[in-house]
Design a protein with these regions (language model features):
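Core segments of small alpha/beta cavity-forming domains
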Residues: 164-215
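Short beta-strand edge/turn micro-motifs at domain boundaries
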Residues: 154-160, 255-286
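Surface-exposed loop and turn segments in beta-propeller and other repeat-based domains
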Residues: 93-112
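Bacterial signal peptide processing site
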Residues: 27-29
């Protein structure tokens, strides 16, 4: 618990130091920073040395993720910042065409101590493409991490993903995507099941089918906040080779006032060589 408090305090402090609120969506600020100007110059050069890092098709989706190095040098390191470009089409229709992401489009006040991370394709459902992206001080865990959701209706949403730096982090991945699917209109049941199967055991799948997709949220998160909350996680020190108890915590956006929690049991499995991996949710309860 003390570790979580320290991590949450660090995240809130970082957000406070970086100023301005977390921006959800694609709207960009009007203030021009030095790295924005450099990034603009790179853009005007037609993305010199553009590198395709992901070119993937799934069902009727086609996703291309590209990177290009900018002229912005990271302070204190012999490294340069980058731009990530995301292009997504569905059924042959282009939904996002070289959608540009920089560290300042993730969070407007990130300075040149931070470097945009690599982008990772997390999940593709019937409704949404999920990509993770962050900005960190090189060779450290200090920075901000986000889940980007590109929906089939052409809308984009950005979710802050606070990192606990322990076995519980993937729980937040699951909750962000599962919650996003629950907020679709109409909700696509197959997409919910896909996310659950990617992160849960057969026992957890059975629980969701029996108790319903909203059963893994505190009642007030559903009724009062309509699932529009900040989600975080923490591990406990009480675990064995079979199970690892964790908690998921729900907060209002940009607030440290806890709404409620849920208990999460992770199921362990032995690694190929040694150790135990806790990478599946087995049950979520009050």
């Amino acid at each position: 618990m003390k570790t979580l408090i320290r991590m949450r305090a660090l995240t809130l402090l970082l957000l406070s130091v970086l100023s301005a609120g977390l921006i959800i969506g694609c709207k960009k600020g009007s203030k021009k920073t030095a790295d924005e100007e450099a990034n603009k110059a790179t853009t005007e050069q037609n993305y010199k040395n553009l590198k395709t890092v992901i070119d993937s098709t799934y069902s009727d989706w086609h996703i291309i993720i590209q990177e290009v190095e900018t002229d912005v040098k990271i302070e204190g390191y012999d490294e340069f910042d980058r731009i990530v470009l995301v292009s997504i089409s569905k059924d042959g229709e282009v939904l996002f065409d070289k959608e540009e992401f920089t560290k300042t489009s993730l969070y407007s006040s990130l300075d040149n101590h931070f470097q945009l991370s690599d982008a990772y394709l997390e999940q593709i459902t019937n409704t949404t493409v999920y990509i993770s992206l962050g900005a960190f001080i090189p060779e450290t865990d200090e920075g901000l991490y986000f889940m980007l959701a590109f929906s089939k209706d052409g809308h984009f949403k950005k979710y802050l993903h606070p990192l606990a730096m322990d076995d519980s982090d993937f729980i937040v991945d699951f909750y962000i995507m599962y919650t996003h699917e629950n907020l679709q209109n109409p909700v696509d049941k197959a997409s919910l099941q896909q996310i659950a199967k990617a992160y849960g055991t057969p026992n957890f799948i059975e629980q969701l089918e029996k108790e319903g997709p909203l059963s893994i949220y505190p009642p007030e998160v559903v009724s009062r906040y309509k699932l529009d909350v900040q989600i975080e996680s923490e591990s406990t020190e009480e675990y064995n080779d079979t199970y690892h108890p964790c908690k998921v915590l729900f907060y209002p956006h940009e607030s440290d006032k806890l709404i409620s929690t849920m208990n999460v049991e992770l199921k362990g499995r032995k690694g190929e060589y040694d150790g135990v991996y806790y990478d599946r949710i087995d049950r979520i309860s009050r």
